[in-house]
Amino acid sequence: MSLFHLIAPSGYCIKQHAALRGIQRLTDAGHQVNNVEVIARRCERFAGTETERLEDLNSLARLTTPNTIVLAVRGGYGASRLLADIDWQALVARQQYDPLLICGHSDFTAIQCGLLAQGNVITFSGPMLVANFGADELNTFTEHHFWLALRNETFTIEWQGEGPTCRAEGTLWGGNLAMLISLIGTPWMPKIENGILVLEDINEHPFRVERMLLQLYHAGILPRQKAIILGSFSGSTPNDYDAGYNLESVYAFLRSRLSIPLITGLDFGHEQRTVTLPLGAHAILTNTREGTQLTISGHPVLKM
């Protein structure tokens, strides 16, 4: 079984019962869960003071336990406050041997992008303690794809995507759209050329999703990729004023501007049903009438 080390660099864990349920679910499955005290920390809306949350991250460089999964408790907001003070060099150096398998999403995207930008460190965009492992019921699709990514040096995700017939190969990167936008022009924005960019978000109206995608487009980031994959955009509900404008309108507009394939429909993001993606790994994307495949390799895995 595996060792989970919890970190809480973002928002306060308001759903304490869900966090405890997640810990219990993992221990019942035979796993060991360390650093559980972070779930109770609070300072204003954050999961502790800046010093405490920063230490969650910087202390990873001193973590010597082998075969360790570092799991973010939740997202929210707070990671952006820490970026300038993270010891990136120490974390990058730590990942050169027996790398920690670092997993999270949402606000945690800022940390993941920083690690990729500062030292090509691969992390996993996937489930977190509260929202996923601590849900009323752990989604079997999510659980399967989590272990699929962490246990296999090469694995393939399949879905029925929407978009043109294509084949693209490159570095898989991305995560939460709003967090990526917040990093443009900073040292923590990865400079990936000819990559496969995967994006998701939550509670953003379709026009806000479009505006953020256009910012990536106008900044030259989208045109420099081989392909774009869009996951779930939970809570992106149009209203009467939109008069038919919706996410499909956004996708159509972007496709009219881009010369690279934009593939939608991947179960990836804030929904209970989500895949786990190693950001920074090598990926091959194929989309045909029969379906879509994403084959991923080159990421760290658990040693069985």
UniProtKB/Swiss-Prot annotation:
It comes from the Bacteria. Disulfide bonds: none annotated. It is found in: Cytoplasm. The active site is at S106, E200, H270. The keyword Zinc-finger does not apply. Pfam families: Peptidase_S66, Peptidase_S66C. Pathway: Cell wall biogenesis; peptidoglycan recycling. GO terms for molecular function: muramoyltetrapeptide carboxypeptidase activity; serine-type peptidase activity. SUPFAM superfamilies: Class I glutamine amidotransferase-like (SSF52317), LD-carboxypeptidase A C-terminal domain-like (SSF141986). Keywords: Carboxypeptidase, Cell shape, Cell wall biogenesis/degradation, Cytoplasm, Hydrolase, Peptidoglycan synthesis, Protease, Serine protease. GO terms for cellular component: cytoplasm. Its EC number is 3.4.17.13. GO terms for biological process: cell wall organization; peptidoglycan biosynthetic process; peptidoglycan turnover; proteolysis; regulation of cell shape. It is an enzyme of class 3 (hydrolase). It catalyses: N-acetyl-D-glucosaminyl-N-acetylmuramoyl-L-alanyl-meso-2,6-diaminoheptanedioyl-D-alanine + H2O = N-acetyl-D-glucosaminyl-N-acetylmuramoyl-L-alanyl-meso-2,6-diaminoheptanedioate + D-alanine. The keyword Cell wall biogenesis/degradation applies. Belongs to the peptidase S66 family. PANTHER family: MURAMOYLTETRAPEPTIDE CARBOXYPEPTIDASE (PTHR30237), MUREIN TETRAPEPTIDE CARBOXYPEPTIDASE (PTHR30237:SF2). Releases the terminal D-alanine residue from the cytoplasmic tetrapeptide recycling product L-Ala-gamma-D-Glu-meso-Dap-D-Ala. Can also cleave D-Ala from murein derivatives containing the tetrapeptide, i.e. MurNAc-tetrapeptide, UDP-MurNAc-tetrapeptide, GlcNAc-MurNAc-tetrapeptide, and GlcNAc-anhMurNAc-tetrapeptide. Does not act on murein sacculi or cross-linked muropeptides. The tripeptides produced by the LcdA reaction can then be reused as peptidoglycan building blocks; LcdA is thereby involved in murein recycling. This is Murein tetrapeptide carboxypeptidase. It comes from Escherichia coli O157:H7. The gene is ldcA.
